[in-house]
Each structure stands twice: as C-alpha cells, then as structure tokens.
Amino acid sequence: MVAITAALVKELRERTAAGMMECKKALVEANGDIELAIDNMRKSGQAKAAKKAGRIAAEGIILAKVSADGKYGVILELNCETDFVAKDAGFKAFGEEVINAALAEKIADIDVLKAKFEEQRANLVAKIGENINIRRVAVLEGDILGTYLHGARIGVMVAATGADEELVKHIAMHIAASKPEYVKPDDVPAEVVAREHQIQLDIAIESGKPREIAEKMVEGRMRKFTGEVSLTGQNFVMDPSKTVGDLLKENNADVVNFIRFEVGEGIEKVETDFAAEVAAMSKQS
C-alpha cells in the first residue's frame, strides 16, 4: 500500500479542484496513482478535465534565437533559484553566451552543451551563490522560423511555411497564451485519444445513456477534445471567431512544428510544511 502523503493530496486538489476528503479517498482507491485517481474522479463526476502536472516553481529565463538565414533556431531554458538572480546581468550574459554557442555550433544535445559550459557555470555559481542549471535546449529547422518571448518566462519557436513574419509572430503569441500540445488534431497520439474516449464513454454510460447514444455523444466530445489540445483546432486568441487553422488557411500558410518552453515546467521546489516543521522541532526539544 502506497503512503498517501499530504503533498499528494494537495497536488490532486490543485489539479481537480475537488475537496480534500474526495481526493484522499480517490488516491487510496488508486493506490497512490494520481493519474488513475484523476481518471476515476472524472468518471464519477467528482472532477472535470484535470490540469496537467507541471507546477511552476523554479526561477530562470527562456532564450530563443534564429540563425541569420532564418532556417535554424534554438530555444533554451536556464534555471536559478530566485527571481532576483534571474534578473542579474551576469546570469543573463551567461545565458546569452550559452545560446549563441548552441546556435553557432548547432548543439542540440543538452549534455554536450552542459559539458561545454560547466567550468563557467561553476564559476558563476561561486560568484552568485545560487545553483544554476542549463536545463534544456531544443532546435527547429524550417523555411520560416519565428520566435516570441513573453517576458523571459515563456518562449515559443514556430516553424511555418507560406507565412510572413507578422503571421508567425501572432501564431507564436497564441501558443504562448493557449498552450497547445500538438500542431493538428490528427497529431494527438492514439493512446491519448483512447484514454479520453474511455473516460467520456464511462461518464456518458454512468449518466444513464444507452451505449449506442453514449457512443454518438462521445464522438462529438472527442472532436472537441482533440481540437482543444491542438494548435489548429483552437480558437485564435486575437480573433476567437476563427480557429488558428482557419487563419492559416486564409493566408495559404501552415505550421510544421512548434516548441513552447515555460520557466520551471515540471520542477517543484521542496515546500516546507510549517506546522509539521514546528511539530518536529517540538519532539526534538
């Protein structure tokens, strides 16, 4: 039996907006498997579509650059421990040096990039007094590349065809705001579709609908689901009356691929439970 910790219950509450007791019960029934707990809660109507895991906790900056010929681009995440250091001139200069090297030498392997700058990173850590991590790097190649940085916390790079610079920037801004996971509805992996289909079917059947009617209901829900998680299926943030797919079609353009980085995605700082800490100190005294 997996121990159901307060941290696990807290994460499930944040992702489902359900009550504490419901979350604890769901985790017990799922033997601590948070994804299974979410699926079961959705089927029973205790939770709507859950938020994705990936609480933003780490600090740092996102950098993105495209080569002079516009055909090759690099996007990079550089982490530190505090927002104060993220704004430090020396930290930013280090990030610029790293991404310039990644672009010039076409370094797409994070381990190679880390090794190249390890000595400088260690020196900067000693100077600043915080841990610094070249966390991830990704590259795109294409006919037309565009980037968008929202502050220094969100970065997007888009590879497109048939689009001008302004359109690519608008698409990148949309991606920054709407967080699509795939380019087109057809790109959603079969296992993701199958999982969502089963959840929606169970919900429909448990609501009392005959299986045949439930199947037809789910067809519509699945079209909505794949549209919502894909770029071309989403309503365009600057004009919600049309989808991004409509916008691209109007301009005889297409998006081949995109990358979206947000500072600290998937990283959690260790959070101290103050009450537990006080209790522990009391026992020691």
Swiss-Prot record:
The keyword GTP-binding does not apply. Pfam families: EF_TS. Disulfide bonds: none annotated. The keyword Protein biosynthesis applies. GO terms for molecular function: translation elongation factor activity. It is found in: Cytoplasm. Keywords: Cytoplasm, Elongation factor, Protein biosynthesis. Gene3D superfamilies: 1.10.286.20, DNA helicase RuvA subunit, C-terminal domain (1.10.8.10), Elongation factor Ts, dimerisation domain (3.30.479.20). SUPFAM superfamilies: Elongation factor Ts (EF-Ts), dimerisation domain, UBA-like. It comes from the Bacteria. One of its GO terms (biological process) is translational elongation. Residues 82-85 are annotated as: Involved in Mg(2+) ion dislocation from EF-Tu. Coiled coil: none annotated. GO terms for cellular component: cytoplasm. Associates with the EF-Tu.GDP complex and induces the exchange of GDP to GTP. It remains bound to the aminoacyl-tRNA.EF-Tu.GTP complex up to the GTP hydrolysis stage on the ribosome. Belongs to the EF-Ts family. This is Elongation factor Ts. It comes from Yersinia pestis. The gene is tsf.
